[in-house]
Amino acid sequence: MRARILLADHQRILTDGLSKLLEQFYDVVATATNGYELISLAKELTPDVIVTEISMPLLNGMDALRALKKSGLRSKFVVLTMHLDMGLAVQAFRTGASAYVLKLGSSEEIHAAVEAALHGRYYLSSAFPADLVTVLAEAARHSDEDGARLSRRQREVLQLVAEGKTMKEVAAVLGISTRTAESYKYEMMRSLGIRTSAELVQYAIRIGLIAVTPLRSAA
């Protein structure tokens, strides 16, 4: 019986290409374009493996992964991203991912990452030093301390603020009042000891809510 795969990426052209690649080996049951859609489809379809990007609108892949892990979903997670970022890789493994691979990697590497996840192993992109996979596997055994400091709603507000949305826009996306959105932001800043919006964005980057280190091909 072929393993069932759920894909998540906001760029449809990429999920279409990835779907064609993986359909040689697995059943691709659905594709999601944001974190909320990913959560809904994952709970409905209970795939064996979820292959997701980190950077997605509304709710990022890391928070979607975190929410699904807390829900008790037994799917394995492969992070497939453009970001060659050690901090994000650590965050992904701590949050529950089995593999972290780059979009610019080979099709064989993507296949290997999914196979590793299916068989209970960890896999790290060959773009990183080989010995780091041991470090990341150890990180996976520790709790997600940074993420645990904020509630899910606070993290939603934080991501939207870090993406550059106004508080009115944040409120509209989340279906809450502007005053409530502002209250979430104020309480976050107070509890984290953060004084400015710029520091809040830096915190969002540090815990992996948004990523700013895209992989550039060599000149």
Q: Which residue ranges define each predicted feature?
A:
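Two-component/phosphorelay signaling modules centered on CheY-like receiver
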Residues: 12-30
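Acidic catalytic/metal-coordinating carboxylates
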Residues: 34-37, 58-63, 84
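Short amphipathic alpha-helix used as the core "switch/output" element in two-component signaling
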Residues: 40, 62-74
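Active-site beta3 strand of CheY-like receiver
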Residues: 45-51
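Active-site residues of response regulator receiver
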Residues: 53, 81
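Short, flexible helix-to-coil linker/hinge segments that flank and couple to helix-turn-helix
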Residues: 87-94, 98-152, 156, 206-212
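Recognition helix of helix-turn-helix DNA-binding domains
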Residues: 164-199
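Basic, Lys/Arg-enriched C-terminal extension of HTH/homeodomain DNA-binding domains
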Residues: 186-219
